[in-house]
């Protein structure tokens, strides 16, 4: 656990230092022990070992709001969505986006499990509601893990009964570790945001390593704030931040059955009003936090050794720029070239050419970081040695200009290695 924590802290510190935080944001100082005041006012969090799939580690997590909290959530676009996704989507509507708790298990996705899976997801909400003396529809349920297997409900129920005794408001490590599957390190961060009527805390935890593709993938993100925000505004802010973060990453091009990003606002702190400067400040902080968490997921991509920012500009529209960027980011040939540290620019423009984005190839321009690789007229006059220095770095950018408009989009991707095949070839064994 110490090695995992050290990896997390080193990676988080590096990304946080590289982030240009917006006005009024104070990034959290995270100690070497990982023990610090993490959660916003009005929240308590617990974790326990339900022994669902993993032994010797926590695999169940509970977030509780002391009072009804404004809630917002986004779910997978996969048509084969898991039972907890269906249930949570329904609960969000039934409760008028007022929630008290989020419960999550790892190791079993409760996906492709039919009517019994739906009954089991409901039973999880019912059990949490009974333990906390709240309504079942005030509970969001999330699961992640192997698809197509029923939950061991006796163990799940026992875990839920044990969770309330573990609730606390200081440490993040138990909760974030409990939601991990193939992740190699926990992903979390928090910031304070200075608003006109006081400072609020904004924090998030996430998991994800494989099945990561735009439109969210096998990733879970849980965010909390003590700001007072109406549910409608919270949903708008979360949706916009999600579009620029979790929906802008890819590891392997697969979209999961269980994706969920949920956010709770306890209302114990300063108010954020629609159309105010406070809304702009809070929105900018939320976007930066979620982008950091999204980058952590890409860095931890199964077998990944590189984090690459892919920007397409000069497109007819932002939508076409995103088409090209996604196709490049998901290209196996591009990803293997990234892993091999090969300046194979032809694979990049070939991917753009099949993306559906419109351009004239003679207008294309390409850069690795600030280094020109391809100039207009398909002139590739660059130093392979200088390019190799950039490609050997753990993190760098690829920028492609289509020369056909003002549209742009940025995504984050990683390389594709032999280890990815090894991890996913033995996932169930």
From Swiss-Prot:
The keyword Protease does not apply. One of its GO terms (cellular component) is cytoplasm. GO terms for biological process: L-arginine biosynthetic process; ornithine biosynthetic process. It catalyses: N(2)-acetyl-L-ornithine + L-glutamate = N-acetyl-L-glutamate + L-ornithine; L-glutamate + acetyl-CoA = N-acetyl-L-glutamate + CoA + H(+). The active site is at 218 (nucleophile). The keyword Acyltransferase applies. Keywords: Acyltransferase, Amino-acid biosynthesis, Arginine biosynthesis, Autocatalytic cleavage, Cytoplasm, Multifunctional enzyme, Transferase. The record marks 217-218 as: Cleavage. GO terms for molecular function: glutamate N-acetyltransferase activity; L-glutamate N-acetyltransferase activity. Pathway: Amino-acid biosynthesis; L-arginine biosynthesis; L-ornithine and N-acetyl-L-glutamate from L-glutamate and N(2)-acetyl-L-ornithine (cyclic): step 1/1; Amino-acid biosynthesis; L-arginine biosynthesis; N(2)-acetyl-L-ornithine from L-glutamate: step 1/4. It is found in: Cytoplasm. It comes from the Bacteria. Belongs to the ArgJ family. Heterotetramer of two alpha and two beta chains. Catalyzes two activities which are involved in the cyclic version of arginine biosynthesis: the synthesis of N-acetylglutamate from glutamate and acetyl-CoA as the acetyl donor, and of ornithine by transacetylation between N(2)-acetylornithine and glutamate. This is Arginine biosynthesis bifunctional protein ArgJ. It comes from Chlorobium chlorochromatii (strain CaD3).
